[in-house]
Amino acid sequence: MNGDRLREHLITLHGCRVVLRPMGESDWDVLARWNSDAEVLWYSEGDDVTSRLLEDVQGIYREVSQTGFCFIIEVGGQPIGECWLQKMNLDRVLTRYPGKDCRRIDLMIGEKHMWGQGYGSDTISVLTRFGFENEGVDLIFACGVADYNPRSRRAFEKIGYTVDQCIENQPGTKARYEYDLILSIGDYLKQKNAERDQVAGEAGRAADGSR
């Protein structure tokens, strides 16, 4: 695999409100802008970085793309963020779940005026469905969700993710605690069945009421 370029794909995913299109080599301008915004990076990164050089931005996404699917998040045809579904790369997770196909979801809403409107949770839902229903994975994680970013944690919990482990950092670090959240294929299917039963029940009650 060539780490000098993005490993591109042809997959486009549709959510209720977002479209996830393939990330490409033509997206560096917008990716560089988001990765130069100190407020965006405060929430999306675990360290104290406030800006990144273009070559660093390119290196990050190109590396991730070798073992994952990288997407640009769009709303109404306009890019608002990025995300990926990647093969797990953290030993602390892999040692807990040996022999399992573990993936991780990471995302950034780079357009700050779009924060708090549900686009993050819709993106997570789309990637989760893709991971379980198309990739056939066993477990999907959100890794290192910081205590100062409760909005991100709530977005994953809204889709059914729960805390798998809490990591306590050294005093004085940016995040005192970080959380790994998990969703298994079994729990995902239970949710899908429950949603299907609820829809069927509501349809049945509506039919009874029309008689």
Predicted regions and their residues:
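Conserved GNAT-fold acetyl-CoA-binding loop/helix
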Residues: 39-60
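Short acidic (Asp/Glu) patches
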Residues: 56, 67, 88
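Acyl-donor (CoA/ACP) binding surface of acyl/acetyltransferases
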Residues: 2-28, 36, 70, 74-211
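An amphipathic alpha-helix signature
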Residues: 25-32, 54, 58
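Short N-terminal amphipathic alpha-helices
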Residues: 30, 42-44, 71
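Short loop/turn motifs at secondary-structure junctions and domain boundaries
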Residues: 61-66
